[in-house]
Amino acid sequence: LNGRPATPRTVQEEIVMPGFANRIEDILASSTRRGLPRKLTHPQSDVAAYMKGVDNFCRVMAIRPGDHVVMLTDPLLDPRVIQAVQGLARGRGATFISYMGDSTRYVTIPDEAKALLERATFVVSTWFASVIDPFCMALRRNKGQRWVKITFFRDLDLLHTPQAQFPVELLGEIVRATGRLFPEKGDFLMRFTDPRGTDFRIPYSDAMLQKLKRHNRWRGQNTAEEDGCYVHYLPTHGPNLFEPGMVGLQPEEKIGIEGMIWAQWAVGFDKPFASPVGVEFRDDVVHAVHGEGFEAEVLRDYLIGGTLEEVGCGHVPKAPRFDIYPAGPNSPGALHFGINALQPSEYLRRVMPNWEEPHIHMDLVTYDSTVTAGNKPMIEDGYLLSLRDPAVRAMAERYGDPVDLLEAYPV
């Protein structure tokens, strides 16, 4: 950066891969655009399509006879979701109990819930703590508990949607194909660029790479069958191109994350950024927020000193392209840069008082990034290259037209 941030390009200068929506104009024109909470109505699908959604639900929730299922919930979760998990557990000869917290925003598990979790073999959770609390990680690692995070399954009617009905095996093959885009071994630099001037770099060691590749999510295991697993339902949010815990980093460990992210949008804002906003990292922390508009002021107010919690990459071709609420986009090649700040944002507390994420968090979003891992391209102008993998295309043939399944994004 040489002490100065790169100058962002204007919207008119953005480069777009023909036929794929990734520009600000595309976001603004989209009927599915959502950056703030609002109730969605999901039209009923036909019975054949609905059964595909039900089948995926039952397979991801891989409850075994004799399991003890604990569900961590919140007051805003559709009660039918709880009933669905309970019914599946009872139908498979498992026991079930649920615990309702005040919200989803716990970053650590409260003591009264720890006693319930200690007995569990299978956990379904809406809580943010599920992924970051060392207590939860230890339960998976030491007791082999299987966890399902349901950030994106808060309404039972989602079973009627194309994203819920997308073949879970095909999704796993897409993830494995993305995993094959990483180098096989050795240290490398993961680099993110885009037409606005983003130049963001994450150094990877071979140890980090091998740890990431062993994770069940990067092996395309999106059903909660393996002891110690952690999966998302609806599958899949991510998996993350970078996540400190997933690559074996210890808290406060620094690896030299540097550079500038000129995001197009962020969770908590109704529309994409009206003027350029750049978040600059130096030595693994947010050093500055560049820009003159309202959005830049909001981010500058609380992100300075924050750290990178994740870089998530969407993998679900039938996820609504421009729905980024509550935790970033799930559409292929769309990225969210998750940053945890040192203090909560008053702005986010005002506009999203019941947000599913803690108010210290921020997901910056890009749809047109180019990502390289060493000298290997992974994403080009927002297009996830694993969608063209021969194994992915061959598997897609089993389920229908590969072009429709893999590249007809709902916008």
Model regions and ranges:
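Internal helix-turn-beta structural module
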Residues: 324, 331-401
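A generic structural signal for short, non-catalytic loop/turn and secondary-structure boundary residues
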Residues: 183, 195, 254-256, 304-306, ...
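Conserved active-site beta-strand-loop modules that form the wall/rim of enzyme catalytic pockets
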Residues: 275-279, 285-288
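Active-site bordering "gate/hinge" segments
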Residues: 13-260, 265-270, 274, 282, ...
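Short, Lys/Arg-enriched N-terminal segments with co-localized hydrophobic residues
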Residues: 1-16
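Dual-mode signal for accessory low-complexity, basic/Gly-rich regions
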Residues: 272, 288-351, 401-409
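Short loop/turn microsegments at loop-to-beta-strand junctions
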Residues: 274-276, 366-367
